[in-house]
Swiss-Prot record, chain B:
<feature type="domain" description="ABC transporter">
    <location>
        <begin position="6"/>
        <end position="250"/>
    </location>
</feature>
<dbReference type="GO" id="GO:0033232">
    <property type="term" value="F:ABC-type D-methionine transporter activity"/>
</dbReference>
<keyword id="KW-0547">Nucleotide-binding</keyword>
<dbReference type="InterPro" id="IPR050086">
    <property type="entry name" value="MetN_ABC_transporter-like"/>
</dbReference>
<comment type="function">
    <text>Part of the ABC transporter complex MetNIQ involved in methionine import. Responsible for energy coupling to the transport system.</text>
</comment>
<keyword id="KW-0067">ATP-binding</keyword>
<dbReference type="InterPro" id="IPR003593">
    <property type="entry name" value="AAA+_ATPase"/>
</dbReference>
<dbReference type="InterPro" id="IPR045865">
    <property type="entry name" value="ACT-like_dom_sf"/>
</dbReference>
<dbReference type="Pfam" id="PF00005">
    <property type="entry name" value="ABC_tran"/>
</dbReference>
<comment type="similarity">
    <text>Belongs to the ABC transporter superfamily. Methionine importer (TC 3.A.1.24) family.</text>
</comment>
<keyword id="KW-1003">Cell membrane</keyword>
<dbReference type="GO" id="GO:0005886">
    <property type="term" value="C:plasma membrane"/>
</dbReference>
<dbReference type="Pfam" id="PF09383">
    <property type="entry name" value="NIL"/>
</dbReference>
<dbReference type="InterPro" id="IPR018449">
    <property type="entry name" value="NIL_domain"/>
</dbReference>
<dbReference type="InterPro" id="IPR017871">
    <property type="entry name" value="ABC_transporter-like_CS"/>
</dbReference>
<dbReference type="InterPro" id="IPR027417">
    <property type="entry name" value="P-loop_NTPase"/>
</dbReference>
<protein>
    <recommendedName>
        <fullName>Methionine import ATP-binding protein MetN 2</fullName>
        <ecNumber>7.4.2.11</ecNumber>
    </recommendedName>
</protein>
Amino acid sequence: MINWLIKVLPNVVSMGWSGDYGWWAAIYQTLYMTFFSAIIGGAIGLVFAIILVISDDDGILPNGKIFWLADKIVSIFRAIPFIILLFVISPFTQVLIGTTLGATAALVPLSLSVAPFYARQIQVVLKSVDTGKIEAAQALGANNWDILVIYMRESFPEIIRVSTVTLISLVGLTAMAGAIGSGGLGNTVVTFGQQSKYDVVWIGTIALLILIFAIQGIGDWLAKRINHADMQ
Amino acid sequence: MSDSIIELKNISVHFQNGSESIDAVKNINLAIEKGEIFGIVGYSGAGKSSLVRLINLLHHPSSGDMMIGQTKTVKNGNVLIKGKELRNLRQKIGMIFQHFNLLDQSTVLGNVLFALKHSKMSKEKRLEKAKKLVEEVGLFDRIDNHPSQLSGGQKQRVAIARALANDPEILISDEATSALDPKTTKQILELLADLNKRTGLTIVLITHEMQVVKNIANRVAVMRDGEIIEKNSTYSIFADPQKPLTKEFIESASGNQEALEKILRQPEIARLQKNEFLIQLGFSGSSTDEPLISSLAKNYGVSANILYGNVETIENIPIGTLIVVLSGTATKLKQALDEIKKQNVKLEIIKEGK
């Protein structure tokens, strides 16, 4: 068995499971980058989305200036290609993390790249909450906090759905973060691909696909399970 | 001091939509009495929705004064209450909507409990009250269902339970039956009328269907282009409408117009003979008791062929319509018509035979 594996997938086997450059390290770095940048970038994106929705003309606290500012920040960060953002913000990363290399340093550009993407998705989701529900809540004497809760709860299945989409695109971004030595499955595939070691490319790609399908599957299942509204 | 619970004085609502300036509500004066069911009728875009949203200040007026109960809420177009005070006022004004506006991700119980979120009652008391409200609207077996599992009528019942959670003195119904079928509409209106009777709840009901106000309203206002063009007791509006738009609404509710159109298409009416008249008679109140038709035959020898008849009871007063063909000699016919005019009956000569 082992001999057969060595014959068919020589470079996959020689990478080894453990060790700094083994498969487990690559998988761990991908999961690490995806998870933490999702939390940090997701939180920033969510805050911006809420600001955009409530300060909009038809929001509960309309404020043209705040909306304009938040909208421009999101648009600008959304417009910068990730591979460029990696280098543009590297001085900032240096100050924040103390280095510009490695998986932890990659969290900064990953978070800043995923935040505006997520903000726009959540903004669309929150805006799709029927204004009638908001009006009914106001008529019942609800305060602004109650209304924010309604926005979130009524769109929760949709929030799960767009979070899944965001998470999947984030896995894609972690592959590019290899350019700053972040490690991870994507980086492994690119590095070995450049050396024409295609067995690693295939196995690395399969591992990434498994991760993406798992995220998609769990997201779809969860969104369906918690939704009580009529399916559109 | 009047018993008004809602008092609007010279109220206007003005929107600026880009370069377009819209007067949604124009200089309205309206006093709604405590405990009455007040209907506001008009086509969409007449300003009904804007008008009722002033009551709970979901919309702000541009000018005028408003009193809700003993609270002055608007003076010279300035809203006097805000923040917690405004939210407390809103809790005393329930509102139901055409599309129910329930929280889809919450259960029936959850929807009602949401309304009690700011109540001073303990958690147990709130739960008890929410359950009682759900029971009152006849949905106790559906208490753990989500809105998507309910029919339109059931959804509106949940919305009513939710609107009543804080024991409001006023209930605003914004086209609440417009998305429901006739049978369910009737049930919901009966529920509202019953609430009004039992608890003295003041109901402001806006609709584009005269049928709805006919069944339950005590008074009716007809709105067009942001103005109230006619306002009277429901009975007077139906018995003696003044404005063409009011007549149009009433005809749409009674089916008289439809009947007349069918009659006019009949060949014998199309070829009405000499000394034959097609007339429409409108009876109301005590005039419905007089045996008019038989007296025409007895006293004038004029025969009356009844083609259509309809009696409706509004606020316990009957209102009737008859469409008949009168025939007799020319002189007798003239005398008969004069006699009808003398009675308390509205006469309309639709067609004269040649």
